[in-house]
């Protein structure tokens, strides 16, 4: 057996050893997710477009200061010009102002309905997963029954019974949409239920509601954010479809779907009345979907090093 020579070894002191250690800064989950998101130019562009649309929907009608409700027959169906930037509709109202107000209404309804969906779904799924047993079985069977009912039929039934309005429309949009979130949260909490910090909280006498809201749900915040980002565009499309069919908001209230319905009737002679609401709606849906995909890539733990 060959003898190992001492010349092959080198005595290294502690100072030199420390100098060769590569120290990686400690980055939190959210900082790492934000770093990943910033490196995605497509998602950041979508975020910029979303912020611009929201700012326009809030401030454009104020800065424009045009009457969007009074009927002026002398100025009806005017093409885009210096006075009416998007033209005027069949009643002489400023289409630019109406488009951005309609966008504000559609986005606000979608955001509120989505938040209600997520809150109800998180609590429902969290309680079902934490309690387990017969409670979980009963609660999940209720979810399956609701999913078996066509959501469009249930939505139309609510709108027919309660009438058309902001609150009625939000209730109709929320009545079954929360079930998907409940299933997702239930599956995640089933994995977290046996964690050490949950067992420690139980040993300290924490109530089930406190454990769910303070320990379990905060550890699913990434999934909740993704659920919000993916649900908002779906709700906007659903609300727009209902309003387009005349089943959404009642006159004089309007949204992008109402403007699309009115523009479709005048499309043959005044195509701009359909064009501008369509462009704004497509930008909103596309931006939300692209930004949601970027968020998913940034928050997915499987992509983390």
Features from the language model and the residues they span:
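Transmembrane alpha-helix boundary and packing residues in multipass membrane permease domains
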Residues: 53, 126, 156-160, 169, ...
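Generic hydrophobic transmembrane alpha-helix motif, especially the helices
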Residues: 85, 89, 95, 116-191, ...
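Short alpha-helical transmembrane interface motifs in multi-pass membrane proteins
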Residues: 15-16, 105-109, 124, 136-140, ...
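Gly/Trp-centered helix-boundary motif
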Residues: 1-122, 126, 133-134, 148, ...
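Short helix-capping/hinge motifs at transmembrane helix termini and TM-loop junctions
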Residues: 60-68, 129-133, 158-164, 176, ...
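Amphipathic cytosolic juxtamembrane alpha-helices at the membrane-cytosol interface
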Residues: 93-108, 112, 132-140, 190, ...
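Alpha-helical transmembrane segments
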Residues: 56, 178, 182, 231, ...
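Glycine-rich helix-loop "coupling/hinge" segments at transmembrane-helix boundaries
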Residues: 159-161, 173, 188-189, 230, ...
């Amino acid at each position: 057996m060959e003898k190992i020579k001492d010349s092959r070894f080198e005595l290294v002191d502690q100072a030199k050893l420390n100098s060769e250690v590569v120290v990686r800064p400690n980055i939190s989950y959210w900082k790492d997710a934000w770093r990943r998101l910033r490196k995605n130019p497509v998602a950041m562009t979508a975020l910029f477009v979303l912020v611009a649309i929201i700012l326009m929907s809030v401030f454009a009608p104020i800065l424009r200061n045009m009457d969007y409700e009074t009927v002026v027959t002398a100025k009806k169906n005017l093409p885009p010009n210096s006075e009416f930037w998007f033209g005027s509709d069949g009643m002489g109202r400023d289409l630019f102002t109406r488009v951005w107000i309609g966008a504000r209404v559609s986005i606000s309804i979608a955001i509120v309905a989505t938040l209600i969906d997520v809150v109800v779904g998180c609590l429902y799924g969290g309680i079902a997963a934490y309690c387990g047993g017969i409670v979980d079985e009963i609660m999940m069977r209720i979810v399956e029954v609701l999913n078996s009912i066509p959501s469009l039929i249930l939505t139309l039934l609510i709108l027919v019974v309660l009438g058309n309005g902001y609150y009625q429309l939000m209730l109709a949009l929320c009545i079954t949409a929360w079930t998907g979130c409940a299933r997702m949260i239930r599956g995640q909490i089933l994995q977290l239920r046996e964690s050490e910090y949950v067992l420690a909280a139980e040993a300290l006498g924490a109530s089930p509601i406190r454990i769910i809201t303070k320990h379990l749900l905060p550890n699913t915040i990434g999934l909740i954010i993704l659920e919000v980002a993916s649900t908002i565009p779906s709700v906007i499309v659903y609300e727009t479809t209902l309003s387009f069919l005349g089943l959404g908001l009642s006159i004089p209230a309007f949204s992008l779907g109402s403007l699309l319905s009115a523009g479709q009737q005048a499309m043959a002679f005044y195509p701009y009345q359909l064009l501008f609401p369509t462009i704004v709606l497509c930008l909103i849906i596309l931006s939300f979907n692209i930004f949601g995909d970027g968020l998913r890539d940034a928050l997915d733990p499987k992509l983390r090093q």
